[in-house]
């Protein structure tokens, strides 16, 4: 089935998920919406995030997608269940698979969750992790400066390194062996985060885990694209297309992308 996979995010963070899907499923077409004009979602109310997420989902429904990936942890926490109940296609989030991978990986059962304020407040990762192993000790840390840093495109260099180190300072005296990047923007900063937490700590990207979920769901439903299908990805941003283009083309390494401005309502 050569219909596109829909991917939505508060901004450019979901491109980390899109990249892993493209790598894992090279024949699939992705239609991506990044709500860059209203990013970040972390400080917003649950109702705002739910409304914005539904607007993106409805826009992609009109484009005849075969599956929707909510590539935003904050949006997954507040809108996944309602979308799964009401959409005519499978809807996946980014929290459960990341939690499963972390529980499998940790040896000491000491897990740090780096995420937005909204995701931390929702308790979604705590719920997912404890449902898998009640002995897991969870250290949640909101990193409100990280998403704006990525969205600005200025996430390389000493200023960015200093900002990341400052954001992770509360972990200095904590004991842990696993870190979940509980925001899809954060894998763009993964190398810098790894440099701060140290080489003995496993840093887990929910993007890679979510791409595995996508493949499994499509295979189960018999809706994988034909092996000779040529992808025709489309990207939509609610904010600046030039800034989105710069980040997307640099991150995805797919050449010149088909990117458009979109108005959601």
From Swiss-Prot:
Provides the (R)-glutamate required for cell wall biosynthesis. Signal peptide: none annotated. It catalyses: L-glutamate = D-glutamate. Gene3D superfamilies: 3.40.50.1860. Its EC number is 5.1.1.3. It is an enzyme of class 5 (isomerase). The active site is at residues 72, 183. Pathway: Cell wall biogenesis; peptidoglycan biosynthesis. This is Glutamate racemase. It comes from the Bacteria. PROSITE patterns: ASP_GLU_RACEMASE_1 (PS00923), ASP_GLU_RACEMASE_2 (PS00924). GO terms for molecular function: glutamate racemase activity. Keywords: Cell shape, Cell wall biogenesis/degradation, Isomerase, Peptidoglycan synthesis. One of its GO terms (biological process) is peptidoglycan biosynthetic process. The keyword Isomerase applies. Belongs to the aspartate/glutamate racemases family. Substrate binds at residues 9-10, 41-42, 73-74, 184-185. The lineage of its organism: Bacteria, Bacillati, Bacillota, Bacilli, Bacillales. Pfam families: Asp_Glu_race.
């Amino acid at each position: 089935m050569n219909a596109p996979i829909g991917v939505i995010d508060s901004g450019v963070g979901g491109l980390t998920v899109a990249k892993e899907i493209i790598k894992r499923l090279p024949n699939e077409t992705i239609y991506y919406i990044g709500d860059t004009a209203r990013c970040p979602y972390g400080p917003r109310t649950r109702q705002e995030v739910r409304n914005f997420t539904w607007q993106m989902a409805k826009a992609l429904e009109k484009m005849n997608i075969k599956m929707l990936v909510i590539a935003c942890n904050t949006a997954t926490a507040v809108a996944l269940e309602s979308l799964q109940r009401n959409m005519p296609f499978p809807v996946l989030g980014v929290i459960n698979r990341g939690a499963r991978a972390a529980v499998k990986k940790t040896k000491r059962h000491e897990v740090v969750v780096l995420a937005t304020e909204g995701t931390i407040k929702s308790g979604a990762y705590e719920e997912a992790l404890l449902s898998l192993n009640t002995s897991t000790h969870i250290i949640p840390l909101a990193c409100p400066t990280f998403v704006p840093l990525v969205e600005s495109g200025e996430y390389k260099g000493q200023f960015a390194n200093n900002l990341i180190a400052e954001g992770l300072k509360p972990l200095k005296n904590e004991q842990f062996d696993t870190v979940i990047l509980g925001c899809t923007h954060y894998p763009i900063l993964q190398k810098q985060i790894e440099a701060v937490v140290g080489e003995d700590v496993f840093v887990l990207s929910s993007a890679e885990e979510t791409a595995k979920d996508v493949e499994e769901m499509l295979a189960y439903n018999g809706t994988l694209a034909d092996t000779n299908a040529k992808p025709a990805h489309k990207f939509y941003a609610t904010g600046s297309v030039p800034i989105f283009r710069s980040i997307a083309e640099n991150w995805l390494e797919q050449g010149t992308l088909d990117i458009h401005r979109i108005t959601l309502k």
